[in-house]
Amino acid sequence: MKQCILKAASVTLPLVLRTKGKQHLSILIYHRVLPKYDFMRPSEPTIKEFDWHMSLVSRCFTPLSLARALELMDRGELPENAICVTFDDGYADNESCALPILKKWNIPATVFVATGFINGGRMWNDTVVETIKCAGEYIDLRKVGLDEYTFNDSQSKRIVAQKILTKIKHREVEHRAEAVDFIESLAEQLLPNDLMATDQQILNLEAAGVEIGGHTVNHPILAKLNDRHAQQEIVDGKKHLETIIGKKLRYFAYPNGKLGDDYLESQVRIVKEAGFEAAVSTTWGVSARNSDRFQLARFTPWDKRSGKFLLRLLLNQKSVKL
């Protein structure tokens, strides 16, 4: 029955929304594709889940590279239900887990890499998550302006980790770093140092046709930085990646990606002046010919059921939220 419903939906929903899907571009955001389910990261798809995501994208949409999509959008020639797949941050599993599936379904992609964490580094949020994951029954973080936390099960650890991330995400860079360093000092085992891509994995992605894009060096909240510091983050990350892949970077993704909260209009100008051709945000919706090329909308598909995943993607063409 489930397969019948899915088949019917995959045929009828694109037809129903066809007029709305013309000249609209959906851009999907992913971060990781996991070898197996991680209770601390329930929203990150496993290999199996990502495979059916891409199956539906391939069968029900028109997947395009970001470059091709923007070219067609400029000419007013976007195909119906055009879609792009992007990844943020530069995780190793983009190459080891996602790339084989992208190849299987012949789906282009763009990976935006924060260069400060590649080759054995670890993003600050992963340090928090991994520390809480291996914690015992109690942790005291009052020293860095947080609380005492008690853990009963895996769900309580996940909830606490999310609370901590929310509380420290928008702290000044140095204050956030101090909190993360303290949290890491309480880790009860060595934390993984292989979460992020290596230079070779970035080269493997690029050689396979994946577009590599800029995502700053240290993934800061750009809105917290002055323009000089923001420019340094944006430009240095771009130059580092250009050195690795031996070609010019064309696209940029704002860390966290909400205008006002995470980046400012002045930093949009910096991205333009740095030589990027376009940039993506995390504002939900679709992009069209008249959209700001340096603040393109993106969309996160998190559904675990194929029917609702498909429906959400299709309704995003109308910017309808479920």
Regions inferred by a protein language model and the residue ranges of each:
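Extended, charge-rich helix/loop segments that form flexible
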Residues: K20, G121-A208
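Residues within well-ordered alpha-helices
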Residues: H53, A98, T198-Q201, Q267
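Short beta-alpha junction loops
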Residues: T115-N119, G285
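Conserved radical SAM core fold
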Residues: R32-L34, I118, G214-I221
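Generic enzyme active-site microenvironment
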Residues: T86-F87, G213
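C-terminal active-site subregion of NodB/CE4 polysaccharide deacetylases
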Residues: M1-T86, D93, W124-K133, D140-L141, ...
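CE4/NodB-like, metal-dependent polysaccharide N-deacetylase domain
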Residues: L28, L78-P79, Y91, L99-F112, ...
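Generic beta-sheet signal
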Residues: F112-A114, H215, T282
